């Protein structure tokens, strides 16, 4: 499936706000890819599709994951905000015919991160975090760091997320904190 067809499908499937966000993530991802030597085409495509499953119901996401035979931990399985990454990685392959494992992996881990992320995973995680429509404490600091040092920006984003989760008394996935400790 070509990018124009994917965008048309996303425009139908996603809310206007989510579609605009995906466009912003794609633009941010391309800029980061050019700055840090990643493939801009991969970054563009991964940026566009990273939230392709975001607005599905938890039950629909679970069905996609189950039908595909993917195993995820219990916390992901029961968390709509996080399960859209794995479900989206499946849709990338099954709906959008994207067979590139780096793109699929970048979509899978864009909400949680993981230790030893490859360059495209880092770029999509960070592009989603610093997208133009994001407005939260430290986002401008992270945007500036992203222009200078990808790993430093990533670490600041991880720490910001972990601190927010702790303040809200919410569960933090072990591989998110492991990635930050790396």
Tell me what each language-model feature is.
Residues 8-12, 32-156:
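Divalent metal-dependent catalytic cores for phosphoryl transfer on phosphate-bearing substrates
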Residues 171-173:
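Flexible, glycine/charged-enriched surface loops at secondary-structure junctions
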Residues 175-182:
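Conserved small/polar residues in nucleotide/adenosyl-binding loops
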Residues 1-2, 166, 177:
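Non-catalytic interface/linker regions that flank or bridge core catalytic/transmembrane domains
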């Amino acid at each position: 499936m070509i990018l124009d067809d994917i965008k048309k499908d996303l425009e139908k499937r996603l809310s206007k706000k989510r579609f605009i966000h995906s466009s912003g993530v794609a633009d941010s991802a391309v800029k980061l890819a050019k700055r840090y030597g990643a493939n801009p085409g991969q970054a563009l495509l991964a940026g566009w599709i990273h939230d392709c499953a975001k607005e599905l119901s938890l039950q629909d996401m679970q069905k996609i994951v189950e039908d595909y035979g993917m195993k995820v931990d219990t916390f992901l399985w029961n968390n709509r905000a996080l399960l859209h990454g794995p479900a989206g990685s499946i849709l990338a392959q099954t709906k959008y015919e994207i067979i590139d494992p780096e793109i699929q992996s970048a979509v899978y881990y864009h909400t949680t991160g993981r230790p030893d992320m490859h360059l495209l995973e880092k770029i999509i995680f960070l592009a989603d975090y610093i997208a133009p429509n994001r407005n939260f404490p430290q986002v401008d600091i992270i945007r500036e760091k992203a222009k200078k040092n990808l790993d430093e920006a990533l670490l600041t984003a991880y720490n910001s997320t972990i601190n927010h989760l702790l303040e809200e008394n919410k569960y933090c996935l072990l591989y998110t904190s492991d990635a930050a400790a790396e």
